[in-house]
Regions:
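Short, solvent-exposed, Trp/other aromatic-anchored flexible loops in extracytoplasmic proteins
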Residues: 82-112, 116-122
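Bacterial N-terminal signal peptides that target proteins for export
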Residues: 1-8
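Short aromatic-acidic-glycine turn motif
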Residues: 73-82
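Transition segment at domain starts
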Residues: 20-49, 123-132
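Asparagine-centered strand-capping/turn motif at beta-strand->loop junctions
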Residues: 56-60
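Beta-strand signatures of extracellular beta-sandwich domains
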Residues: 68-72
Length: 132
């Protein structure tokens, strides 16, 4: 009986911990992403559904892969009311290039904010011939 109560207490504690973690807003994985990318966007509707469309510019000379965008829906005071993470179509963004994106909005809001949530840069290894 004591073991059962202990297991239940442990499960409740784990659920409480997960709930408090889930309540934290998402933030970009790479602080300072703005040094490498510029994002512009505007809201629009397609068949009565809200979307954001815009462009992401890779101002760094290296291809970015697995690019994900973080879309924040904000209320009139700037507080986050909803968030979503979306993959950039194609997921690759060559260096010094611009790519168009569209993201469906889950919850309409007063304003939106789009940031680069995650990415990897492809750095190629250079193989030097060995001297004889």
């Amino acid at each position: 009986m004591k073991l059962r109560a202990l297991v239940i207490a442990a499960l409740v504690g784990m659920l409480a911990a997960l709930t408090s973690v889930a309540a934290q807003p998402l933030t970009p994985h790479f602080p300072g992403w703005e040094r490498y990318f510029t994002v512009s966007w505007e809201p629009f509707e397609r068949r009565g559904q809200p979307y954001l469309r815009g462009y992401i510019v890779n101002s760094y000379g290296v291809t970015a892969t697995r690019v994900q965008l973080l879309v924040d829906s904000l209320d009139s005071s700037g507080q986050i009311v909803a968030q979503r993470v979306e993959w950039l179509v194609g997921s690759n963004l060559p260096g010094f290039s611009t790519t168009y994106f569209e993201v469906p909005i889950r919850q309409q809001a007063s304003r939106y904010r789009v940031s680069v949530f995650a990415f990897d840069f492809v750095e190629s290894a250079r193989i030097e011939p060995q001297a004889p």
